[in-house]
Each structure stands twice: as C-alpha cells, then as structure tokens.
C-alpha cells in the first residue's frame, strides 16, 4: 500500500479526555424532565408525560453539541451492558438455585429443562409440570441448559459463581457509565477516530474475543464434553481448573497436548488435529456440531480478526485510511462515488446506527436459520420447543432491527444530511432517481402480491370445486423450486471438493443422512417442493412491501412533490398543517409506523412456515430399522398449498393444545393466548379512531368533574394523532407476538 508524504507526518494519536466534565447531581436527576427547559417546568396537561417519554432519550433535542450527544450515547451503552450482565447473572442464578440442571445433564434426552418453580399461591402451582428427574417446575425453552453443557458446566455451584461474576460486571459497567460521563469524558475527536476504533474493535473485541472463547473451548469445554459424551457422570469429572493446569490429564484425552507448543512454533499445526478438527456434520451422540470443529472455527476467526485489527492507520503512518478508501471508491457510472460518506459516518450517529441495525438485523435472521440447520449446542436439535423458540426469537429481533435501521436512516436524512456536502455522490444519485426506484419497487410488490396470492386463490378454488388434478401441487401441476434444489445439491456436493477430508456435509438440511438422538430426529434432508415454492413467493412479497414502505420513508424524508419542505417539519409530524388536506401519514415516522405492520406480516409468515415445515418434514421419531414418523405426518406439501389448508391444518389444528390447556401445566399459555388477543383487539381502538372523538369525550368527562368540584389540576388531553398511532402499534405488536408465543409454546411443549 502506497504511503504519501502527508501520511508519514500523521500526528500521533493522543488520549482525548476531559476531566470532571459534568457534575454528579442527584438533585438535578430527581427533577422529571431536567433535560428540557419546557418539561422541567412540570405538567400543565397530560401531554407532558408523553413528551417526557418521547424526549428522554432523544439527545439531539436536548443539546446541539455533537460531543455532548456522543458522550451521552457512550455512557448509555455502559448502562445497557449493565442491564445485560444483570440479566445474564439472573439466568445463571436461576440455573443455580431453581433448576434441574444436574438431573438434565445426567439424562438430556428424556428430562426436560426447568429453571423456575412457581410458588403455591391461588393454585398457580399447577404450572409446575413434571419435567422428569423428580423435579416439578415451569418448562423453559431458552437453550441455556444446552449452552451450559457446551461450555463445560457440570454443576449448579459453577452457575452460582458465574451469577456472582455477572453481578460484579454489572456493577463495573454502571461505574464505567458514570465515570466516562462525569469524571473522564472522551472528547469528540476520540469518538471520530474511526481507524483506532476499527483496529480495537476488530483485534480486541472480535479477535481476542474469539481467541479467548476458543481457548475456553479447547482447555475446558472439549475435555469435559468428551467425558460427558462417553457417559462419565458429571460429578466424576475433574473440576475445570484441573484441565487447565494438568497437561497429563489433557493428554489422556487429546494426545497432542504431550507435545506442548513445539508443533505450533515449528509450523506442524496438523499435530493438533485431535482437538482442532474439520469433521463437518453433527456429533451422533448429542446431535450438535462437533465442539472441536467449533473451537477450530473460533481460532481461525480470531487469527483473521487480529490481522484485520492491524489494517488501519493510527500512530505509525502505515495502513489504510477510512476516508481515502471511501473517496477512492468510485466507478465510471457512479459520479463522485463514496465521497462525503466519511464525514457523514463521523458526524451522524444516526447514519452509523442505521447501518449497524440493518446489519445486525440481517445477522440475527441468519443466526435463526443456522440454529436449526447447524444446531450448535449438544441436545438442542432434539429439543423441538427450544428450536422453535430460538428461531422465532431471532426472526423477531431481526425484523425489529431492520425496521430500526430504516427509522434511523430517515432521522439521519431529516436531521443530519447536508445536500451541499453530498453533490453527485452515490447517496445523492440514489436520492435523485428515487422516483424510479420506488415506482419499480412498487411494481415488483404488485406483481409478487398478485401472482403469489393468486396461486393460493387458484388452488382454493380448484379444491373447492373438486378438481385436484388442476391444482398447483407436487401431484398435479408442479411448480418445483429448481433453483433452490440446485443450491441445496451444490452445498451437499461442494465439501467433497472444498473440504475433501471432511467426514460429512456442512448441514444435513442440504441432503445426506438422518441424524437421530435417542430415537428422535435431530436433523435430516429438507426436501423442497411446490408448497415451498408458493410460500417462498409470499415471503418475497411481504419482504418487498416492507422494504417499499421503509425505503420510501428514507428517500422522501426531506422532501416530496406533495410536501417539498418536509425537512423543516421534522422526522415526526401528523399532517402538513391546517388547510393542506391529504398530507397526513407522510412523515418518516409514519413510514416506520406502517413498515412495522408489514414487518409483522413478514415475520409471521416465516415463523408459521418454519413451524409447520419442521413438524411435517423434519421433526419426529425414527425406529431402529429406519422407519420415520413425523409429528404431522408430512402434511405440509398437500395442505399448505391452499389458504384453507393453512387455516384448518396449521392454525386451527395446532391451536388445540393452547385452547385445551386449562387445568394443565400449560394453562398459563391459554390465559396469555386469550389476553394477547384482547391486547391486539384493544390496539384497533387507537388505530381506527381520530383524536377529535376522544377530545370531545374527555371534555364531557371534565365537565362532569367540574360539576362535582373535583376537576384535576393537570388538564386532560386526548392523545395526539402520532401518540395514538404509537399506542395502537405497540399493542398490535405486543398482542400479536403474545398470541403467537403462547400458540407456539403450548403446541411445542406438547410435542417435545
């Protein structure tokens, strides 16, 4: 890489910290709304409490100083980490004190996990199911037990110490959040030093993180899991530190430990192949990925990330400059290319957050799919309720993060975008042909919606008329997903060329053998047919509509033909003032509001598809002579090709467990199912009525209070249009997710 003379004179990185930046004042914090001159005056109307919640974390509205905003975000991150460590501590504390972890560890196939016991008050102890191993408790589906097994935890005492460690880390994070805001607050230059941040995050956070994790797996998790797999009782296994300090003990399990570090320094790395493996496939004892493969994977990643963490130029005048990379990134048809993006990403945290949320959301969705296709932890693949829970969980998180990415992209456009600094770069060029983008995307949505839904309407009609031979199905007019089948086949065959020494395929979802653990199917080839082709096009439709709404909100955040001065109205506004009809629901906030409904649609179809497909074609039992019996007997291919089939054979048929749960350990799910339906229906009251109706009602109620001489000091006000939509949306999503959660879990627990 070429180094210019100006780069050679790059000034050394200094430590940019301001001492005693902000006074620690409990008296100030005790005043509600202290961050806003208007809110600090106290409530005059009930709108005050809404504005308090809306603006508490909107640091942009509290100060115009980018440095102050940066410090607040940085400090808030430590608060977030404190909450996460506290949550982790709580999970481990429950595992240590209220769980059947030891019993589960001794027989993970037939004993269910539980880490919560309900107290016998008003008869609610009925929720304590008999999960096996002489334990009654609420069956949990979080996957913690399987993860603890993979980490090499063999007793509740170890969980207890981790819980204490989590508490200490939580307290440390709280202290760090206070210290780096009040005592030693970083200056703006520190936050904007992209190269140093990249080096430290890549080499430190990811590189050393992966290295320490692979170190833990090699020295502690691998030997303990090898003994557990061999049937050694947990209480007979040496304590973790003994594997760390006793090389002889390790060498009994992995002979290459006898050779020490000599093979490492002489380049004979193949000597370590007894614990750094490349087997592929799943461990037949546990149904999870080979732990030695996982250790190898993290070691390789750590090397890559540590290398990557030395790529960027800081004190030593060598390495990449982020600004130069971006400004050099231009082609013959892209104008100024990425010029101006460096300034955007170092002055707008909304722009950076938008990218990070979109990436993390996508990553969460990728994780959801890897969790079942390549189950990472021992015995997780045969715990169907946990598999369904984790898939649903990661899909929801992915959906919310992607929508959040669009939200902050739009906030960036409204608050931080400067057109003069972005002339003819890629962002400007996208904005200038936004009409072409959105109109084409709209056409794609109409095409996908009409055709994918049309296939189902056709099938329902043909089935209703008794003409099965004219339906789109594997037995009549076939619509085979030939490209998906081709991709599956490539992935099945590829390891033969790319990893010739691997023992098995990357994932049995692509093809290969049936992996079973204790007579239950962990993973097997997932055959795709007409039913999958049809529902995948529904996925394409719902995702494209979500993208259409969100992208329109970003691209038209500053202006549109309807509202040319939209940037002046801000991110969130109900309508463009009185006298301008037809301008409501056009703010960027409203696009996020509408996008969330379609995100809900998208994720619902995905998790319904997954739940039914796995029960129909993967999950089930296998006899010693190879006879497979799936939970719903392979009915997905013939039933899911009609809308009636989805309603009758999935929603109604599989809702029987939650509907009939009263009087059983699953009865809480029956109550949640009912309550969540109510919360969902309650949302419609906010979504289908206007502010004026409620204001009139409130004024009549206030009149009655005045008549009786107990009128409130704080004047009641109806929710604003935006507030009403926010409350409606929150209840719609909460009700919908609660309904799906209870429906899935009552069903999954009964089939696990």
UniProtKB/Swiss-Prot annotation:
InterPro entries: PSI_PsaA, PSI_PsaA/B, PSI_PsaA/B_CS, PSI_PsaA/B_sf. It catalyses: reduced [plastocyanin] + hnu + oxidized [2Fe-2S]-[ferredoxin] = oxidized [plastocyanin] + reduced [2Fe-2S]-[ferredoxin]. It comes from the Eukaryota. It holds the Pfam family PsaA_PsaB. One of its GO terms (cellular component) is photosystem I. Keywords: 4Fe-4S, Chlorophyll, Chloroplast, Chromophore, Electron transport, Iron, Iron-sulfur, Magnesium, Membrane, Metal-binding, Oxidoreductase, Photosynthesis, Photosystem I, Plastid, Thylakoid, Transmembrane, Transmembrane helix, Transport. Its EC number is 1.97.1.12. The chain crosses the membrane at residues 73-96, 159-182, 198-222, 294-312, 349-372, 388-414, 436-458, 533-551, 591-612, 666-688, 726-746. PsaA and PsaB bind P700, the primary electron donor of photosystem I (PSI), as well as the electron acceptors A0, A1 and FX. PSI is a plastocyanin/cytochrome c6-ferredoxin oxidoreductase, converting photonic excitation into a charge separation, which transfers an electron from the donor P700 chlorophyll pair to the spectroscopically characterized acceptors A0, A1, FX, FA and FB in turn. Oxidized P700 is reduced on the lumenal side of the thylakoid membrane by plastocyanin or cytochrome c6. This is Photosystem I P700 chlorophyll a apoprotein A1.
